[in-house]
């Protein structure tokens, strides 16, 4: 008796060039840092930034064009992967650019920080090209484990270690829920391949309680990673307790990676049973809009305020998924990318006003910023206006597009609800500007600090928010093309 074995197909490694490059360079950065003196830590930083620039270029070269699947169907190369990875690399570059002065001032400028960041970004890129449940989980855990370590990076800070422990425990529970959901999906469908899961879901998924239970657990696990209410409880403590640079990092690229997670699992894997998971996403979106905005109103710590406002922005991103259309998914991606840019600038201003022994964490620390630095006050105005959704900024287009996506599918009540809470959310953003422009600086307020490079980066960030608001077409077109939709 002869047993036939399937023919081995050599994987196309060229499709995974961004991940291979990131993996190799993360190891190179570690080795270079190992043999570098403290006075030459800048070399590690420059090498990290070079790695991300090349990774973004490789993502376009490797993925833009016809879709392809390799590594036995576990890895997909398509336009969506290209856009996601360019956004992840770009936001990672921006996050590291903001962190150098902060880390150097506090004696934390070590190669391990950049290595952890690169491995975290590698996990996000793996998620962006995942075509298999195990590949999704592999990328997600690589992201999560490195973020836990980054939160606790300042080991002498008790708040940071406490926040890292909370994040780790809650993250482990969420990972277990997600993995259990994936195992139920595998038990129902007999496959880990997302394309095969979609075929089964289309044929009899709506009547298979095992698949529906697995779907429910997967949504819960993904909602935690995204920071959607009521699975957002880790965010305020992590944002407040972690070094500000880590809070900046966690609020930017991982949100784009969460969009990748939603798209690959819910759209591609469980898309045929959209009617079953849509009500869950509606509940998550509504809860995020309500709790995120109302809780942010009561905050005096600006990092906690930004954490709760992140939950409200997640609610807006979820509106795009509720639509269940390619246009809706593309607007969610556009929102996540633009939110990452806005959030980086907001945390960047906190970093600018902070120095060794003083963290500008309270909203009152921004009193009289206009008197101390009119240029930085203007950047704060642009960022807060954009987060509010004032016309002329990119935040307005992001909100308008996701709201339009739910109107297009007949959920007008949800669109009105989102607009109402967007107006409520404007209060705490405008309150920050009240401190910046109308309050006098306290006598013991520290002077506006930061290197010329740091101030230049903030100016560029603010201008980007303004220019993307005036000329949003290129970014919108790229997000639409990622889902095969033409814009215009």
Curated annotation (Swiss-Prot):
The chain crosses the membrane at residues 15-35, 42-62, 79-99, 108-128, 133-153, 168-188, 209-229, 243-263, 277-297, 305-325, 333-353, 376-396, 409-429, 456-476. GO terms for cellular component: plasma membrane. GO terms for molecular function: NADH dehydrogenase (ubiquinone) activity; NADH:ubiquinone reductase (non-electrogenic) activity; quinone binding. GO terms for biological process: ATP synthesis coupled electron transport. It catalyses: a quinone + NADH + 5 H(+)(in) = a quinol + NAD(+) + 4 H(+)(out). It comes from the Bacteria. InterPro entries: NADH-Q_OxRdtase_suN/2, ND/Mrp_TM. Its EC number is 7.1.1.-. Keywords: Cell inner membrane, Cell membrane, Membrane, NAD, Quinone, Translocase, Transmembrane, Transmembrane helix, Transport, Ubiquinone. NDH-1 is composed of 14 different subunits. Subunits NuoA, H, J, K, L, M, N constitute the membrane sector of the complex. HAMAP family: NDH1_NuoN_1. NDH-1 shuttles electrons from NADH, via FMN and iron-sulfur (Fe-S) centers, to quinones in the respiratory chain. The immediate electron acceptor for the enzyme in this species is believed to be ubiquinone. Couples the redox reaction to proton translocation (for every two electrons transferred, four hydrogen ions are translocated across the cytoplasmic membrane), and thus conserves the redox energy in a proton gradient. This is NADH-quinone oxidoreductase subunit N.
């Amino acid at each position: 008796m002869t047993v036939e074995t399937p023919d081995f197909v050599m994987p196309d490694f060229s499709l995974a060039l961004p991940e291979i490059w990131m993996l190799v360079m993360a190891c190179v950065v570690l080795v270079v840092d190992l043999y570098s003196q403290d006075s030459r830590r800048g070399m590690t930083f420059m090498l990290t930034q070079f790695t991300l620039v090349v990774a973004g270029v490789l993502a376009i070269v490797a993925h833009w064009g016809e879709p392809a699947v390799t590594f036995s169907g576990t890895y997909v190369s398509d336009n969506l992967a290209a856009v996601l990875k360019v956004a992840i690399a770009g936001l990672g570059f921006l996050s590291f650019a903001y962190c150098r002065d902060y880390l150097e001032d506090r004696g934390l400028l070590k190669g391990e920080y950049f290595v952890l960041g690169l491995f975290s970004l590698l996990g996000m890129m793996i998620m962006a090209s995942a075509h298999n449940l195990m590949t999704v989980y592999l990328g997600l855990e690589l992201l999560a484990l490195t973020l836990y370590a980054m939160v606790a990076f300042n080991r002498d800070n008790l708040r940071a270690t406490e926040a890292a422990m909370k994040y780790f425990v809650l993250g482990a529970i969420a990972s277990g829920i997600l993995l259990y959901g994936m195992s139920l999906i595998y038990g129902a469908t007999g496959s880990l391949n997302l394309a095969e899961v979609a075929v089964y879901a289309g044929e009899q998924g709506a009547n298979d309680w095992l698949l529906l239970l697995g779907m429910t657990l997967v949504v819960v696990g993904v909602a935690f990673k995204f920071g959607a209410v009521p699975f957002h409880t880790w965010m305020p403590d992590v944002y407040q307790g972690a070094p500000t640079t880590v809070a900046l990092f966690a609020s930017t690229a991982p949100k784009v990676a969460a969009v990748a997670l939603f798209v690959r699992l819910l759209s591609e894997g469980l898309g045929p049973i959209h009617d079953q998971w849509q009500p869950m996403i509606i509940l998550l979106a509504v809860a995020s809009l309500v709790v995120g905005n109302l809780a942010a109103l009561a905050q005096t710590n600006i990092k906690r305020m930004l954490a709760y406002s992140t939950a409200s922005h997640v609610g807006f991103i979820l509106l795009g998924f509720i639509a269940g259309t390619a246009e809706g998914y593309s607007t969610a991606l556009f929102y996540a990318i633009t939110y990452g840019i806005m959030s980086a600038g907001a945390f960047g201003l906190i970093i600018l006003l902070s120095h060794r022994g003083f963290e500008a964490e309270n909203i009152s620390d921004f009193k009289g910023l206009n008197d101390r630095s009119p240029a930085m006050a203007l950047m704060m105005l642009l960022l807060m206006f954009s987060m509010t959704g004032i016309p002329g900024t990119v935040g307005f287009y992001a909100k308008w597009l996701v709201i339009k996506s739910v109107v297009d599918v007949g959920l007008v009540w949800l669109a009105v609800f989102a607009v109402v809470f967007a107006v409520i959310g404007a209060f705490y953003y405008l309150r920050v500007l009240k401190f910046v422009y109308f309050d006098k600086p306290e006598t013991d307020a520290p002077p506006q600090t930061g290197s010329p490079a740091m101030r230049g980066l903030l100016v560029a960030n603010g201008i980007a928010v303004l220019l993307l608001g005036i000329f949003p077409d290129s970014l919108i077109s790229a997000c639409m093309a990622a889902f095969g939709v033409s814009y215009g």
